[in-house]
From Swiss-Prot:
Its EC number is 2.5.1.55. It is an enzyme of class 2 (transferase). GO terms for cellular component: cytoplasm. It catalyses: D-arabinose 5-phosphate + phosphoenolpyruvate + H2O = 3-deoxy-alpha-D-manno-2-octulosonate-8-phosphate + phosphate. Pfam families: DAHP_synth_1. It is found in: Cytoplasm. GO terms for molecular function: 3-deoxy-8-phosphooctulonate synthase activity. This is 2-dehydro-3-deoxyphosphooctonate aldolase. It comes from the Bacteria. Pathway: Carbohydrate biosynthesis; 3-deoxy-D-manno-octulosonate biosynthesis; 3-deoxy-D-manno-octulosonate from D-ribulose 5-phosphate: step 2/3; Bacterial outer membrane biogenesis; lipopolysaccharide biosynthesis. Its main location: cytoplasm.
Length: 288
């Protein structure tokens, strides 16, 4: 007989992140372009999520360290970025998530933000995992595009061995040949199992990247962000990870995948309705 899986709850302040709880929205800018833009985007998300009663965490990067071209905009850097994050937290009372790329960044970043993120390309770097684990912060682990869902258990185990079990797993698509990504929704349950019920979320905007094989920046398919997000929530997820911009065509990074800020409210109305419906169903075991 197959016993039901226990869903682990990870707390971000008073926000509970779990696969059987109402979905949490991790959303904001791909990269900090300016203090004023960050304030504008964060304020809009706070207003909409308060109205719809959706738990919310602001996301952005202070340094996009893995841009395709050395000439691409990377961000304001850690020092200025942390000042902006601190101001957002003070002004709007919002929780914040951002990524770290180097060992020395883990501690100072964790002292300001509420969740630190392990980037997909760095997810198997043991020294970085150890440094992040030691902060005691909640960790969001991006699943590498090249890694199977089952292999995520090894990364979770690394964090546990280093004393941190406050782990969220984030799917951002899987390589499908060259320069294309697909989302394997069957993999969500595998990640839940190998992580012993850790929360699993979907990065629906990054998963829509579609590269020009000879280009210096990613293309994208933002016209499909709603359908991909619905597909993820239909499986039963702890949250969505969404990037947005007031003018995606002018965004300094990943604009082709970004949800227009003007579409945030109708988008979230749909997502909340679907999530509420899916999580109202009793668990159905079809294995026996």
């Amino acid at each position: 007989m197959v016993l039901p899986m226990q869903n682990k709850i990870v707390k971000i302040g008073n926000i509970e992140v779990a696969n059987d709880k109402p979905f949490v929205l991790f959303a904001g800018l791909n990269v900090l372009e300016s203090r004023d833009l960050a304030m504008q985007v964060c304020e809009h998300f706070v207003k909409v999520t308060d109205k719809l009663k959706i738990p919310y965490v602001f996301k952005s990067s202070f340094d996009k360290a893995n841009r395709s071209s050395i000439h691409s905009y990377r961000g304001p850097g850690m020092e200025e970025g942390l000042k902006i994050f601190a101001e957002l937290k003070k002004t709007f009372g919002v929780k914040v998530i951002t990524d770290v790329h180097e060992i020395h960044q883990a501690k100072p970043v964790a002292e300001v933000v509420d969740v630190i993120q392990l980037p997909a390309f760095l997810a198997r770097q043991t020294d970085l995992v150890e440094a992040m684990a030691r902060t005691g912060a909640v960790i969001n682990v991006k699943k590498p595009q090249f890694l199977s869902p089952g292999q995520m258990g090894n990364i979770v185990d690394k964090f546990a061995e280093c004393g941190n079990d406050k782990i969220i797993l984030c799917d951002r698509g899987t390589n499908f040949g060259y320069d294309n990504l697909v989302v394997d929704t069957l993999g969500f349950n595998i990640m839940k199992k190998v992580s012993k019920g850790s929360p699993v979320i979907l990065d629906a905007t990054h998963a829509l990247q579609c590269r020009d094989p000879f280009g210096a920046a990613s293309g994208g398919r933002r016209g499909q962000v709603a359908e991909l997000s619905r597909a993820g929530l239909a499986v039963g997820l702890a949250g969505l990870f969404i990037e947005s911009h007031p003018n995606p065509d002018k965004a300094l990074c990943d604009g082709p995948s970004a949800l227009p800020l003007s579409k945030v409210e109708p988008f979230l109305q749909q997502m909340k309705a679907l999530d509420d419906l899916v999580k109202s169903f009793p668990e159905l075991n079809t294995e026996n």
